[in-house]
């Protein structure tokens, strides 16, 4: 007997911190300039999380709460949380587990 598994991404959320760090801000901190950075990376500004005590899982939580509000979901309906980050809150547990706990998605699986 063959079982066919079917999966679909039904929602995607995002969160961008309010604080901007521009290349001009970086010029004041290190020996660089806007032109040098833009010519090598194409980046002119980046967003940074400055609130004390906040971390990657808090940004992920905001993204999922956006989905929950828009789609009128119960957090228990969330089957899987995928989180990719180079700045985890801590090495273990995974950031996706922390996000799931914060939003009340108690039955989710995690992809990291």
Residues of each region from the PLM?
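Short glycine-rich or small-residue beta-strand-to-loop segments that form or flank ligand, phosphate
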Residues: 79-85
């Amino acid at each position: 007997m063959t079982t066919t598994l079917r999966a679909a991404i039904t929602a995607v959320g995002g969160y961008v911190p309010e604080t901007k760090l521009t290349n001009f801000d970086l010029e004041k901190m290190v020996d660089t300039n806007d032109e040098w950075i833009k010519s090598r990376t194409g980046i002119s500004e980046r967003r940074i999380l400055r609130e004390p005590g906040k971390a990657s899982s808090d940004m992920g939580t905001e993204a999922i709460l956006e989905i929950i509000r828009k789609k009128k979901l119960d957090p228990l309906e969330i089957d899987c949380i995928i989180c990719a980050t180079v700045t985890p809150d801590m090495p273990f547990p995974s950031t996706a587990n922390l996000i799931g706990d914060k939003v009340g998605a108690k039955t989710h699986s995690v992809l990291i």
